[in-house]
């Protein structure tokens, strides 16, 4: 991919690396991630900044969703450890889907806090 190509599998919000999963239009274009699609456009920059700050977690979510090979999942677990967030490791009792949803919820909550924080500035 060169500088003029756009990865249409990613969210349309500038700089967002999350997977695009929902469309803002009935025409099927303007695809966004699950966080940007629900947000006011005025909040998109704060959301994208927070998702970029948590890039290791965004990558984990993308790997789980893609059912990445074990080699990649080892890297995901290592990055979670490096971020000192062992609470986000997969629990023995949860399926990959449950883990995925839990990590997405962490991202959504963190973005909501970032929006509130920006509104207080």
List each model region and its residues.
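Intrinsically disordered, low-complexity regulatory regions of eukaryotic proteins
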Residues: 1-121
